[in-house]
Structure formats: structure tokens, C-alpha cells
């Protein structure tokens, strides 16, 4: 486990480049900062300033090396590196509320933006007119879209929203791709087609994730539940009410294992039993370390004023937390190995810190932990 504190401000979202040498983060404002690793240090190399509202989503396309950002100013920008400068291209999303999340499609020929306008904007580049255009997925979304994730086939899109639903839509754009092959989710996939909708009312859906095979989708909700739907099991849904505070982010690390994190400030493991179609709690992944009590320095006291609105170091303010992160974890991303066999994943949090977790090290540190 490696932890680096970038900022006093919360990190609201992040994205990595292809070779994992650079990370783009939003310091909870209208800017995006790009840091590059140099030895054991992280040095700021770029600042992307074009939004005039808080940046709410970042995604970095690995092959084309383009960054897409969205924000509360209701716009998205596609950033292209020309020389040593990132050049922005405005994408008109045609929404009247804040954009909340953005994701490149696997083939990088389009991206999706979820918003408070109760729509998902599917944006693609129109060669004839030399600009980005978008189509809207509207029905039956009834509230803000908080999270998105793409199926490996580049067509299906999972969305979690504030109307307590996880849905899977077809985002097929005939202008930029061939007709998709049938999937376990369905064979007819015209644009905007609803392929799946969760029936349980479980709270705001903060995070969604497809498995590596694309036949499973997991989501986490504000009532501390974790759910998984398996298309190979006739859309059977496994639900687990966890004992944690609400989880904000989730990702598959194998076909049967999930890592999620949120307001408890540490990642937890969940395991899916394919035969029984059930989810079980696999354990906490952040091993508490016994540390001796000591006095606070003046520097730490001022940092606590910024991070926790308190100069005291008690448990209520987070200094007494035995977790690596001292505030809510806002995002999880797979660093190496992919969703099929993840070997490293990354978390960023509202404490302004970033942690890199090694799966094998976690397995050896936690003797009872077995990641299937």
C-alpha cells in the first residue's frame, strides 16, 4: 500500500494515463491538475483551466491519449496534447443542469455524460462538420445520473441515478460503429433501448460497474446495499445489506470479486457466489496499524483546520481513524491487470490523498482473505 497526500482540498475525481505515470485530479474546484511521478515524488506538470464551474468527472483515453472532463457549468471538454500543451475542444451537451460523470467508451470513439437534467448525453465526433455532437438517452430516467460504466462491447451502458435505479441502455451510434452482436442482455439494441432496470428501491445509486466479461453489473447505493445482476442467470439479482456506511464507488477486480469504498474511508471486499447467486462480505482491505499516541505539531493542527474543520486530533475529526484515508473515498480505479485479474487498484478521497493497493500484498497481510 502506498499513500500520497496531494492536497489539503478534497480530490473529487481522478483518471490515469495509459502507462500509469501520470494522474489527472480535480482539487474540488474548476481546475484539473496533472501530476507526473518522478522517483518517489509526484510533480505537477499541467493545469487544465477551461471550466467555469466545478469539475465533476474526468476520464483519460489510453490509446488516443485524450482527456474528457465535465462540470457543473453544463459543458464537457475534450483535451488533446499538442506539443507540451493540452488544447480543449468544447462539447455542447444540450443540458440545463450540472453534468455529474463522464466515461470514454472502450473503443474511444464516443463518450457518455450523466447529468442532473435526467438525461445521458452520448457524444461522438462528426467528421464532416469537424465537431462533437451528442444524442440524448431520456426515458425512463427520473432523476440525476450519478454514475456510468461501459460494457466491453462498446454499445451497452450501465447508469446509476438518484431515482434509486440501476439501468442498462443501448448507446449504439450507427454513424461511428457497426451493428453489435447479440449479448446475454438482449439482441435488439437500437439507440436508447432499455436492456435492464433494477426493481429494488435501494437509495441513490452512487457507483456502477460491468465485469470484465460484460455479463454482470454491480452497483452500490446510499442505503449501504451492494447489488449484482447476472445476465447469464436470467437477470437474477443478488443483494447484500452491508454493515458499512454508504459506499460511493465499486469495481470488479475478478469476475467474482468486488472492491467498494465510501464514507467508512477504507475499501472492502465482496464475493459473488455464481452457483447460489449470492453476495457475501469478504472483509476490510485496510489493515489497521497500531500507532503510539503522540502530540500534534503546529503544522498538523493547521492542516486539520482545513481538512476536518477542527484543530483537535480526536476520533471524531478523523485523526483517530485507523484507516489510510482520513475521509470518505470518492473513487476507485483499476491500475493494472484489468477487471478480470486486477493486481493493483487506486483510491482517491476527500482527504486529498491517493492510495495504491496491491492485491497480492493484501491477500498475504489478511490471512483469511481469499480473492477468487
Curated annotation (Swiss-Prot):
Looking at the UniProt record for this protein, which Gene Ontology cellular component terms does it annotate, in alphabetical order? Arp2/3 protein complex; cytoplasm; nucleus
Predominant place of localization: cytoplasm
Q: Which Pfam families match?
A: WD40
Protein keywords: Actin-binding, Cytoplasm, Cytoskeleton, Nucleus, Repeat, WD repeat
* Top-level taxonomic group: Eukaryota
Listed PROSITE patterns = WD_REPEATS_2, WD_REPEATS_REGION
| Subcellular locations according to the entry | Cytoplasm, Cytoskeleton; Nucleus
Single biological process term from Gene Ontology: Arp2/3 complex-mediated actin nucleation
Q: Which cysteines are joined by disulfide bonds?
A: none
Assembly mode: Component of the Arp2/3 complex composed of ACTR2/ARP2, ACTR3/ARP3, ARPC1B/p41-ARC, ARPC2/p34-ARC, ARPC3/p21-ARC, ARPC4/p20-ARC and ARPC5/p16-ARC.
* Name under which the protein is recorded: Actin-related protein 2/3 complex subunit 1B
Originating species: Mus musculus
Top-down, what is the taxonomic lineage of the species of origin?
A: Eukaryota, Metazoa, Chordata, Craniata, Vertebrata
Amino acid at each position: 500500500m502506498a499513500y500520497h497526500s496531494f492536497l489539503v482540498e478534497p480530490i473529487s475525481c481522478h483518471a490515469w494515463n495509459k502507462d500509469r505515470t501520470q494522474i489527472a485530479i480535480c482539487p474540488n474546484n474548476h481546475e484539473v491538475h496533472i501530476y507526473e511521478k518522478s522517483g518517489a515524488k509526484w510533480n505537477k506538470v499541467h493545469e487544465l483551466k477551461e471550466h467555469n464551474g466545478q469539475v465533476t468527472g474526468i476520464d483519460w483515453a489510453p490509446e488516443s491519449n485524450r482527456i474528457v472532463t465535465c462540470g457543473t457549468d453544463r459543458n464537457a471538454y475534450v483535451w488533446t496534447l499538442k506539443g507540451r500543451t493540452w488544447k480543449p475542444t468544447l462539447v455542447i451537451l444540450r443540458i440545463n443542469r450540472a453534468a455529474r460523470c463522464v466515461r470514454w467508451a472502450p473503443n474511444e470513439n464516443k463518450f457518455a455524460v450523466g447529468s442532473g437534467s435526467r438525461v445521458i448525453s452520448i457524444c461522438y465526433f462528426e467528421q464532416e462538420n469537424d465537431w462533437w455532437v451528442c444524442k440524448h438517452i431520456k426515458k425512463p430516467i427520473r432523476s440525476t445520473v450519478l454514475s456510468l460504466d461501459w460494457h466491453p462491447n462498446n454499445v451497452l451502458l450501465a447508469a446509476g441515478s438518484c431515482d434509486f435505479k440501476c439501468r442498462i441502455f443501448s448507446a449504439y451510434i450507427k454513424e461511428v460503429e457497426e451493428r453489435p452482436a447479440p449479448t446475454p442482455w438482449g439482441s435488439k439494441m437500437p439507440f436508447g433501448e432499455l436492456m435492464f432496470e433494477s426493481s429494488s428501491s435501494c437509495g441513490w445509486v452512487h457507483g456502477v460497474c460491468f465485469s470484465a466479461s460484460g455479463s454482470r453489473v454491480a452497483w452500490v447505493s446510499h442505503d449501504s446495499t451492494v447489488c449484482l445482476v447476472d445476465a447469464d442467470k436470467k437477470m437474477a439479482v443478488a443483494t447484500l445489506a452491508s454493515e458499512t456506511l454508504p459506499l460511493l464507488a465499486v469495481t470488479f477486480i475478478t469476475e467474482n470479486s468486488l472492491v467498494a469504498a465510501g464514507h467508512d474511508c477504507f475499501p472492502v471486499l465482496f464475493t459473488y457466489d455464481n452457483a447460489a447467486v449470492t453476495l457475501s462480505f469478504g472483509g476490510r482491505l485496510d489493515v489497521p496499524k497500531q500507532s503510539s499516541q503522540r502530540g500534534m505539531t503546529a503544522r498538523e493542527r493547521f492542516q486539520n483546520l482545513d481538512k476536518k474543520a477542527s484543530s483537535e486530533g480526536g476520533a471524531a475529526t478523523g485523526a483517530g481513524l485507523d484507516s489510510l484515508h482520513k475521509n470518505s473515498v470518492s473513487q476507485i480505479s483499476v491500475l493494472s491487470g484489468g477487471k478480470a485479474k486486477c493486481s493493483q487498484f487506486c483510491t482517491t478521497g476527500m482527504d486529498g490523498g491517493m492510495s495504491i493497493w496491491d492485491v497480492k500484498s493484501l491477500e498475504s497481510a489478511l490471512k483469511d482473505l481469499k480473492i477468487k
